Amino acid sequence: MRATFSSRLVAIVAALAITVVVPALAGRPGGSAYGAGVSQQAVGAAAQAAAVRYWTTGRMTRELIRQPPPGTRLAWLSGDTAGAGLRWTHGGPVAAAVGRIFFSLGGTDYVCSGALVGGAHPDVVLTAAHCVTGGPGRGRATQWAANWMFVPGFADGRLPYGEYTAHRFLVSPGWTAPSGGEADDFAFVQVTPATPGEGPGAAKPPPGLSVEFASSQGMAALTRSYVFGYPAEPPYTGLYPAFCAGRVTASGGQVGMPCGMTAGDSGGPWLAGFRPRRGTGQVTAVTTYKMSGDLAVLYGAVLGPQARALYQRALRSAR
């Protein structure tokens, strides 16, 4: 078990060995800061190639083969599924854009969730900051992830749109500062297609999801959301996308919702204005943690003005 941000928090990032872990601050040197409101780390071509070699299909799926929970019909469309954590089987842009993240940190392999954002030709992934760094800076050097890989639409070991490697990590300075906290736990990653997809239409990359930023860091755009991710602890396997839906509460730059999804869901998007039959909506937050004393509620960081500035920087420098 790694050190927590606070004694009450459990981050929803999972080790491939299927243990619940939380990000720990690393001791080795890492990123650098530039400009106002951005901490970043570039990833070279050699490191990107190493990630492709490292994450074989076998490594991606090892120790994660379990029977998934039963699916559901469209009856849930008329009500909340809070706490259910159902498998998403209805397609749409969300099924293609949301994906699984694989990375190494401190010699251990981990998994998270994330989503392509930014329109028809996306080259930016939204995830949690602790899915690219070792944790809040607490005044020490930040360790950045190695072997970082994003697989959009990952399902049962298939890579329908191929693999994306990280070109640059961007997080809020609030996350790496000594006072960094959960409200700053969001990151944007500039990505590069690394391997082709599998199956019909695989050459065409999936469109990125739309992002809607709150007018202030402490407010969410709407009171109802759908949350997506790749939970990996039982009864889940991490081999398919799952979701929860329901009303949310917002306070202090964070949102909460009853949801039974487990470790591995960190970095998954929260979508407001979601249309289940179309699989479309606006991303307003990103999954960050659960309270150790109340694992029935999932929490996320609201994407406010600081996230908007980071996102715009990521788009400009990626294009």
Task: Specify the residue positions occupied by each region the protein language model found.
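Protease-domain processing segments flanking chymotrypsin-fold serine proteases, especially trypsin-like
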Residues: R2-A3, V10, V22-G119
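Catalytic nucleophile loop of clan PA
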Residues: G260-V286
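Chymotrypsin/trypsin-fold serine protease catalytic domain
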Residues: A166, E182-P258
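C-terminal cap/linker of serine protease catalytic domains
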Residues: T284-R319
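Loop/turn elements at helix/coil->beta-strand transitions in domains of secreted/extracellular proteins
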Residues: A96, H121-D123, A221-R224, G252-G253, ...
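Conserved catalytic-core segment of clan PA serine endopeptidases
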Residues: A84-D109, V117-G118, G139-E198
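Terminal peptide-recognition signature
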Residues: T56, I101, G114, D123, ...
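Acidic glycine-/aspartate-rich tracts in secreted/extracellular proteins
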Residues: C131-V132, F154-R158, P193-P196, P231-E233, ...
